C-alpha cells in the first residue's frame, strides 16, 4: 500500500498544535494525560475510575432469569458527583458472579421506591434493566 512521504517539518508543526488542543480539552474534562514519544499513540490518558461493590444476599448461584432488574440503592448517586466515573458491581452471595454497570447508565429515570423490611414505605433504588449492564463470572 502506498502512502505519502513523511515530512518531518510539517509533522512537527501540526502534531504539536493538535496535541496541545486535545490535552487542553482532556484537562477540562478532568482526564490527566502525558505525552510519551515512542511512535505509538500521541497521548496517554489516565482515567480515574472508582469501583463500588454490593452483595445481593438473595442471589445464590446463577442469576435468576425471572429477575429483569438489578437494584442499587439510589443513595449511591452521591458517589457519581462531579462526573466521577464509578463502576458498580452487584455480587451474588458467594461472590462468584457479578452484575457490572457503569455510572453512565445510572439514569434518574430508573429510580423507584421499593418497599422492604427496613423502609416499608419504600426506599429509593435504581431499578436497572439487566440489559444496561453485564453479568461477569468471578471464578478463576
Question: Where are these predicted regions, by residue range?
Answer:
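Nucleic-acid endonuclease domains
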Residues: 1-50, 55-140
Amino acid at each position: 500500500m502506498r502512502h505519502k512521504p513523511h515530512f518531518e517539518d510539517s509533522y512537527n508543526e501540526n502534531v504539536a498544535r493538535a496535541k496541545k488542543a486535545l490535552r487542553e480539552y482532556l484537562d477540562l474534562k478532568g482526564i490527566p494525560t502525558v505525552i510519551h514519544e515512542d511512535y505509538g499513540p500521541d497521548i496517554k490518558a489516565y482515567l480515574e475510575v472508582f469501583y463500588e461493590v454490593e452483595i445481593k444476599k438473595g442471589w445464590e448461584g446463577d442469576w435468576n432469569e425471572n429477575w429483569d432488574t438489578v437494584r442499587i440503592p439510589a443513595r449511591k448517586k452521591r458517589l457519581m458527583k462531579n462526573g466521577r466515573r464509578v463502576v458498580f458491581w452487584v455480587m451474588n452471595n458467594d461472590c462468584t458472579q457479578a452484575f457490572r454497570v457503569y455510572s453512565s447508565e445510572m439514569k434518574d429515570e430508573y429510580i423507584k421506591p421499593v418497599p422492604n423490611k427496613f423502609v416499608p414505605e419504600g426506599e429509593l433504588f435504581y431499578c436497572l434493566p439487566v440489559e444496561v449492564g453485564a453479568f461477569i463470572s468471578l471464578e478463576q
